[in-house]
């Protein structure tokens, strides 16, 4: 799934009247992979969600650090492994104002806190691509989707895996 910046509206004021070109819409920020995160971003560019896994205790960890928070190993040998991308919504928020110029044309949007199916409390945050007026509930099933934000750069996001049924705990954003 792809998404890009919203088209800039026509400028108002003297510049529009004189025919001057409007300033280009700022682009979204893109990841700047470092040595530790490069495998994650390379997989994301192929639309594959990966999570770091400790070589000592096999626990998935987001984000990987110098020490495994589960077993305490100071030499966790984290390796990024593909995961299903399936999970459930644990929480969400509606972003209505962006302080980053590259997102100004895209508000409002939903950010979801997702618990991945691979492990209890394995949580990641991403944009929900179903739109800001989507009806959500805690426990709603989601699946990974990807936003192609630049050539060769994709960012993991989520989409509802099935329509939310009306019922207890359902909230309209």
Residue ranges and their predicted role:
Residues 86-88, 92, 131, 147:
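Residue-level recognition of beta-strand microenvironments
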Residues 78-88, 138-140:
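Short coil-to-beta-strand transition motifs
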Residues 62, 75-79:
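Short functional micro-motifs and their immediate structural scaffolds
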Residues 53-56, 69-73:
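Short, cysteine/histidine-rich loop/knuckle motifs that typically chelate Zn2+
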Residues 48-51, 58, 65:
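Residues immediately within or flanking Cys/His clusters that coordinate Zn2+
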Residues 90-129:
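Glycine-rich active-site loops that engage anionic ligands at enzyme catalytic sites
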Residues 117-173:
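Well-ordered alpha/beta subsegment
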Residues 1-51, 159-161:
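A broadly conserved sequence feature marking short terminus-proximal activation segments
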């Amino acid at each position: 799934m792809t998404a890009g910046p919203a088209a800039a509206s026509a400028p108002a004021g003297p510049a529009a009247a004189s025919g001057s070109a409007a300033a280009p819409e700022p682009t979204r920020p893109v990841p700047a992979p470092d040595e530790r995160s490069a495998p994650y971003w390379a997989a994301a560019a192929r639309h594959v969600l990966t999570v770091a896994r400790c070589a000592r205790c096999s626990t998935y960890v987001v984000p990987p650090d110098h020490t495994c928070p589960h077993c305490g190993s100071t030499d966790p040998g984290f390796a990024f492994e593909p995961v299903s991308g399936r999970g459930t919504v644990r929480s969400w928020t509606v972003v209505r104002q962006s302080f980053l110029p590259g997102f100004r044309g895209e508000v409002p949007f939903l950010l979801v806190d997702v618990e991945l199916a691979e492990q209890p409390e394995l949580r990641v945050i991403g944009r929900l691509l179903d739109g800001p007026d989507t009806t959500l509930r805690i426990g709603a099933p989601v699946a990974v989707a990807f936003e192609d934000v630049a050539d060769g750069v994709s960012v993991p996001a989520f989409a509802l895996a099935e329509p939310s049924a009306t019922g207890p705990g359902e909230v309209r954003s």
